[in-house]
Amino acid sequence: MGRIFTVELEGRSYRCRFCRTHLALPDDLVSRSFHCRRGKAYLFNRSVNISMGPLEERLMLSGMHTVADIFCCCCGQNVGWKYESAHEKAQKYKEGKFVLERGRIVDEIDLSTEVYIDTHGSTSDTEDS
């Protein structure tokens, strides 16, 4: 595998929760009312720094769609899916758009309020007991 070049988005952005790679801009957000197996999901017009899995037919709550899972190009985590085609006329607006699972992305607000707790005990020799 060769060197990975990523796109750095200007301003506030949605990023991969696992490696903080930029994935989408708030200006490309279409809807926050989507759902996935793991909870909430957001629909975007565009997404960057992703790779796509194979196309597959998937039965969603809104009907049958042709979709491909999308993965962060840096860490390889599944972050959502892309709608390639919708079988029902009312769902055609989704074609070519990206769904990012809310639990797998963070935005600038999340980054500024995130708290990290070290759950592993220290193994320092100088630590007092």
Swiss-Prot record:
GO MF entries: metal ion binding
Keyword set includes Acetylation: no
InterPro entries: Yippee, Yippee/Mis18/Cereblon, Yippee_fam
Annotated Zn(2+) binding sites: C16, C19, C72, C75
Residue ranges of every copy of the Yippee domain listed in the record: 12-109
Keywords: Metal-binding, Zinc
Family affiliation: Belongs to the yippee family.
Name by which UniProt lists this protein: Protein yippee-like At5g53940
Species name: Arabidopsis thaliana (Mouse-ear cress)
Higher taxonomy: Eukaryota, Viridiplantae, Streptophyta, Embryophyta, Tracheophyta
